[in-house]
């Protein structure tokens, strides 16, 4: 230990530097080290300054230069000859300046950091630059220690640069060819060092390494064995290889081991110190980085983000979240009236409706720090990291107040806490949730930190998270209405090169896509542009949008799937049954298109209807929807006297509608006006039902009666119009795709009056009329 401390003192420049000891370590000549290279030569030109010292260098460098001026041996000489280190004085910067080995400044900075001060953007930048300087300083120290360790390793392994050889290679490739200059025996290790002549050729190639090692079994009889080999090779006495013996000193090996140990410990100390500095939690811990909240800071002042004008639709939601932005921009307008801004808001709604997009707009418009983090990033495998990251996130938010914290997909950490004693609860998630509750509204909660969160599973969130004082404002973002869909289409059509103005497409596309989310609408616009580019068009046309809508609904046509003639007939009658029942009944949607082309979503055909924006349904409307879904199954049974598995999805829809009418809508007279929630699976797949087994049997019976009644009614409609069913099926087998105009020409208009629809043929005719009038250029062929 004393030797290690002595070595470290020699590495640390101070008022009285010790360059002799440093260079002795670098050159490999320490006390007690023996070498066969000869004795140290006396110093020459000791007082003659050269290099940087002659130009007025620093005093430590001048002192080191005066001592290191003579010719060098070992690794130092090799470095100088190869111009890796052009001058010995260059070794001084490698070991670091006096600042790098002085910790007094660091301690003073740490004391300054402990002083309380308010954070401004300038302070944040200054603190960031200071931490970068400190990190750079410790990296320089690590770099210096690595260089010292590398040099010491080179000094120790320089003699082994040629590798090991066998006795046969030594005799046949070296000794017999006269390439050996001398041999040195190391008795303690049973190793023989073979030194070659400069420019020696071994194994047919010139070798740069002039020393090789050879392991010998009986080192005492090596010289005898060597002379016997020379006799066999008829080598004359004057050309015999000289043999010398080398004994390693114990003190030199011990000093080298202590030096490497000291350097290794110093490297480890600096690594842990650097890790402790990097963590914002402070302290000497390498796990501080794991505890840091990995949030994203959104700077709204750059002007590159999403504004409220870029968010189409969602008028009510934008109005509610705009209050947070107005409060952060001008809080005095609210405070003078005694109003308090809500502590947080929860954005709810189906996937793809724009919750995250609205949060991005808030980040841009608020002009305050916006810290965004995803819910799954809180929870890791290591226990306790979730709570630590919550503390880190809110600590940073309070330092930057006024500030907005946004947690996306909060259901990952905000699920309801388990109340059972079964032991299956997730303790890590509950700890994270508890810490989040405390940070949002606890003893140390401060104002001017607003929390935004989004999820599409509000039913699983804990009640304590959604109470007033935490996420007290719930903003529901539902699927867009007709007007909102038109605005969203207008927004996404701005970036496309269209044949007609965007207003020509937006209203029609909005009517074609009821129930579509904003993400679906963006996908339709993108698919239309991709299809136009794939077809080689110079602009996006109407049929490109038709293709995009059809692709999103049913998938793209799969031309590689070829059906047999019999299967094509079954699919044609199946789809004709859907279309005919929907055409003849009163409360069904308009049939826009019927196709028997296979699709990539495993559908062998589809009937495209035009659903209406309808929120209330009568019993008759739901019943006729069941009949329309059963039209394909009934058409198969009537036409072929058998049924296939193609109606699986239709039967699933019919069953769901029937049970909804009985269990939730109260439309079954025998059950009465009661409503039960949908069945949810509990622990181990066992569901809890709020009704008896007898009532369940009654509801099953009522649902079965409804489905049977709908099927009988569907069969009657098809049997009364069997010729029309045959005509539709034949047209499908001939054309593969028929639309509203084709159906009307085949079987006449709907008996209950024209249905609300957007006919693709009329849309195309309208576009052609515009083009004929010269308002826009003609579409590309």
Swiss-Prot record:
Origin: domain of life: Eukaryota
Enzyme Commission no: 3.4.24.-, 3.6.-.-
Effect of residue 575 to Q: Absence of proteolytic activity. No loss of its processing into the mature form
Composition bias type Low complexity, residue spans: 36-56
Biased composition range(s): Basic and acidic residues: 109-135
CDD domains: RecA-like_FtsH
Subcellular location: Mitochondrion inner membrane
Modification note: Upon import into the mitochondrion, the N-terminal transit peptide is cleaved by the mitochondrial-processing peptidase (MPP) to generate an intermediate form which undergoes a second proteolytic cleavage mediated by proteases AFG3L1 and/or AFG3L2 removing an additional N-terminal fragment to generate the proteolytically active mature form.
ATP-binding found in the keyword field: yes
Catalytic reactions of this protein: ATP + H2O = ADP + phosphate + H(+)
Main location (coarse class): mitochondrion
Keywords for this protein: ATP-binding, Hydrolase, Membrane, Metal-binding, Metalloprotease, Mitochondrion, Mitochondrion inner membrane, Nitration, Nucleotide-binding, Protease, Transit peptide, Transmembrane, Transmembrane helix, Zinc
Propeptide residues per the UniProt entry: 44-105
Membrane topology, as annotated: Multi-pass membrane protein
UniProt binding sites for Zn(2+): 574, 578, 650
Mitochondrial matrix topological intervals: 106-144, 270-781
Cofactor binding, per record: Binds 1 zinc ion per subunit.
Regions that span the bilayer: 145-165, 249-269
GO MF annotations in UniProt: ATP binding; ATP hydrolysis activity; ATP-dependent peptidase activity; metalloendopeptidase activity; zinc ion binding
GO terms (BP aspect): anterograde axonal transport; cell adhesion; mitochondrial outer membrane permeabilization involved in programmed cell death; mitochondrion organization; proteolysis; regulation of calcium import into the mitochondrion; regulation of cell adhesion; regulation of mitochondrial membrane permeability
Active site residues per record: 575
The protein's assembly and partners: Forms heterohexamers with SPG7 and AFG3L1. The m-AAA protease is either composed of homohexamers of AFG3L2 or heterohexamers of AFG3L1, AFG3L2 and/or SPG7. Component of the mitochondrial permeability transition pore complex (mPTPC), at least composed of SPG7, VDAC1 and PPIF. Interacts with MAIP1.
Family: In the N-terminal section; belongs to the AAA ATPase family. In the C-terminal section; belongs to the peptidase M41 family.
The protein's name: Mitochondrial inner membrane m-AAA protease component paraplegin
Organism annotation: Mus musculus
Taxonomy of the source species: Eukaryota, Metazoa, Chordata, Craniata, Vertebrata
